[in-house]
């Protein structure tokens, strides 16, 4: 394939934008090539500025569960634009989407809309601190919760891709309030809680870790966190920015039947437009300004375009059999890629939860950040480039999740498996 215009645009972008991109992982650094510049997308396909067509498993990093440019969502957003893009004032649309989220997500009794997942997690932690009167938070190595200062300690996603566990610019005074445990290891959590008795405001966790690849929770892990938080008066926060409305309509908490105190959301609930949300028990959420003293605000929070896209997306997700069909497609492609690797004699460790999946370039099981970090990232980089040349667009990092959309056809999935088989044989 020819990528000459993308290469030219990347050179231009680096003169005006730090690193040439507006989010680090997009730079393709860890896969040893220049990024694609995208012109348009439709359904399961994405098209670059050189006219190349790709089957897309990035899906804008998760939001595009319906595929790109779903006609019903596009029509609704176009209609909303005619009424105004943003008012900085309440609208009925905010109530509609809030009520849909409350009905869907078991833990949410009240919800506040924001404009990004980072805002959601940052605000949820502030609220948990205000509710408990405690300063410390506990997170897990390899779990990414956005780029607010206190959460950039041993983070996943882009931070993992670039091998930077702690970002310069984060004061030590911030970091000292952040405790880090091992994902899927209750013993490490119990130890930290015991050492910091009555000091921890919240435990924040991705119930399905999606920012070090796709790492499911081990049996009893989420249940153990729930019990511990109840016993110790700690607010349990599920970061479902990625898994919310993705692994089930009610998110991972519905799938695993574990209810946190608070939940953060994003991605899918905005239908491809900038959005975030955090919600939980009324007794906690009522402490938010203006009803309480914990401050949070945003110019574009609850803007009518994102609310409209979210409402239409959630309506479509309620279609009978939607998640069963999506699960079938996801199982088909994930197991097909795993079989292709096995047939080629190339060792991978395959994981999947709903329509999130990952092919770890590892001979051993992956269940936490240490085991994920041991993967052969150089082999993955070669695999990524081979797949790209076959018209398959994957996330440009071993430490990211692949997403299946309802728009992926059986033909798309078969082409993906065939491309993987060819790539593994080359490796």
UniProtKB/Swiss-Prot annotation:
Superkingdom field: Bacteria
A matching Pfam family: Aminotran_3
Top EC class for this record: isomerase
GO molecular function: glutamate-1-semialdehyde 2,1-aminomutase activity; pyridoxal phosphate binding; transaminase activity
Pathway where this protein functions: Porphyrin-containing compound metabolism; protoporphyrin-IX biosynthesis; 5-aminolevulinate from L-glutamyl-tRNA(Glu): step 2/2
Entry keyword set: Cytoplasm, Isomerase, Porphyrin biosynthesis, Pyridoxal phosphate
Cofactor(s) demanded: pyridoxal 5'-phosphate
InterPro entries xrefs: 4pyrrol_synth_GluAld_NH2Trfase, Aminotrans_3, Aminotrans_3_PPA_site, PyrdxlP-dep_Trfase, PyrdxlP-dep_Trfase_major, PyrdxlP-dep_Trfase_small
Subcellular location, record wording: Cytoplasm
GO biological process, one term: protoporphyrinogen IX biosynthetic process
SUPFAM superfamilies hit by this protein: PLP-dependent transferases
Listed EC numbers: 5.4.3.8
Reactions the enzyme catalyzes: (S)-4-amino-5-oxopentanoate = 5-aminolevulinate
One annotated Gene Ontology cellular component of this protein: cytoplasm
N6-(pyridoxal phosphate)lysine modifications at: 267
Assembly and interaction partners: Homodimer.
Family per similarity comment: Belongs to the class-III pyridoxal-phosphate-dependent aminotransferase family. HemL subfamily.
The protein, known as: Glutamate-1-semialdehyde 2,1-aminomutase
């Amino acid at each position: 394939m020819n990528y000459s215009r993308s290469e030219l645009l990347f050179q231009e972008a680096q003169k005006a934008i730090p690193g040439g991109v507006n989010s680090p992982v997009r730079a393709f650094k860890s896969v040893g090539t220049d990024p694609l510049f995208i012109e348009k997308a439709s359904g399961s396909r994405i098209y670059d500025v050189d006219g190349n067509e790709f089957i897309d498993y990035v899906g804008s990093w998760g939001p595009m569960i319906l595929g790109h440019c779903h006609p019903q969502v596009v029509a609704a957003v176009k209609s909303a634009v005619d009424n105004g893009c943003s008012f900085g004032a309440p609208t009925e649309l905010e109530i509609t989407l809030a009520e849909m989220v409350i009905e869907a997500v078991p833990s949410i009794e009240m919800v506040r809309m924001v404009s990004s997942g980072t805002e959601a997690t940052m605000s949820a932690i502030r609220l948990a601190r205000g509710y408990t009167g405690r300063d410390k938070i506990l997170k897990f190595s390899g779990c990414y919760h956005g780029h607010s200062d206190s959460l950039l300690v041993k983070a996943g996603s882009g931070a993992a891709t670039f091998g930077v566990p702690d970002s310069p610019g984060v004061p030590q005074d911030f970091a000292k309030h952040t405790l880090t445990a091992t994902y899927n290891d209750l013993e490490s959590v119990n130890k930290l809680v015991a050492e910091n008795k009555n000091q921890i405001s919240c435990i924040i966790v991705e119930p399905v870790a999606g920012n070090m690849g796709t790492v499911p929770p081990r049996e009893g892990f989420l249940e153990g966190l729930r019990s511990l938080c109840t016993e110790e008066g700690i607010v349990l926060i599920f970061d479902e920015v990625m898994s919310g409305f993705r692994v089930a309509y009610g998110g991972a908490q519905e799938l695993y039947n574990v209810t946190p105190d608070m939940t953060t959301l994003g991605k899918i609930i905005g239908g491809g437009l900038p959005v975030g949300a955090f919600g939980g028990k009324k007794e906690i959420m009522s402490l938010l300004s203006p009803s309480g003293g914990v401050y949070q605000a945003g110019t574009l929070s609850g803007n009518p375009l994102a609310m409209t896209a979210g409402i239409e997306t959630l309506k479509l997700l309620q279609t009978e059999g939607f998640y069963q069909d999506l699960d079938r497609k996801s199982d088909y492609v994930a197991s097909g890629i795993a079989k292709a690797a096995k047939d080629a004699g190339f060792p991978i460790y395959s994981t999947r939860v709903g329509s999130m999946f990952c092919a770890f370039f590892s001979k051993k099981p992956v269940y936490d950040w240490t085991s994920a970090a041991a993967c052969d990232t150089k082999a993955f980089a070669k695999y990524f480039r081979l797949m790209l040349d076959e018209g398959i667009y994957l996330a440009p990092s071993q430490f990211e999740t692949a997403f299946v959309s309802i728009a992926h056809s059986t033909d798309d999935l078969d082409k993906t498996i065939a491309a993987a088989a060819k790539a593994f044989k080359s490796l």
